């Protein structure tokens, strides 16, 4: 809703209550409801929650981020979210396996906590995704702190198409004519 309001009414200002604004808020949400944390962080990076955010077996997939390559062919990233305290390189390895199984171009590991050095090594071992002269890490790790600081996944051409765009509303002045 927030994203669509901003698209429809550029320059609009409003407050959203109940959504994390800092790491403490993200941690509180994760402790209270892991599923809501997962939906929040997935949507915040512009991805779609798996099966619309419904609970159930997800086979290691918490969301998808859709984009197009240099040839305008649809591609996707698999999103894996970990909101717990204990995260390991095995979790990144599992995402890499899921990416291969699902033939995903990219993988996004979204976490509440800072990754370990071993996790970063595992992510970098996935290599790079290249299209149209652009090169981005194939498996990317982003923390809640980075996301709250407006850092987003590196996607070729910076273009994602996860959600339908809201139509831009005409200003009040335009309606008077």
Features from the language model and the residues they span:
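Mixed-charge (Asp/Glu-Lys/Arg
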Residues: 1-177
């Amino acid at each position: 809703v927030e994203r669509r309001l901003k698209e429809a009414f550029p320059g609009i200002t409003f407050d959203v209550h109940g959504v994390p604004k800092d790491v403490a808020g993200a941690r509180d949400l994760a402790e209270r409801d892991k599923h809501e944390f997962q939906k929040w962080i997935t949507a915040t990076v512009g991805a779609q929650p798996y099966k619309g955010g419904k609970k159930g077996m997800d086979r290691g997939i918490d969301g998808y981020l859709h984009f197009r390559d240099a040839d305008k062919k649809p591609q996707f990233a698999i999103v894996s979210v970990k909101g717990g305290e204990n995260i390991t390189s095995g979790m990144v390895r599992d995402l890499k396996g899921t990416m291969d199984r699902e033939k995903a171009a990219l993988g996004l590991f979204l976490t509440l906590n800072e990754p370990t050095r071993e996790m970063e090594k595992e992510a970098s071992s996935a290599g790079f995704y290249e299209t149209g002269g652009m090169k981005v890490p194939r498996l990317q790790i982003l923390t809640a702190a980075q996301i709250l600081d407006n850092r987003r996944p590196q996607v070729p051409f910076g273009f994602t198409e996860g959600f339908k765009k809201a139509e831009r509303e005409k200003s009040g002045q335009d309606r008077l004519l």
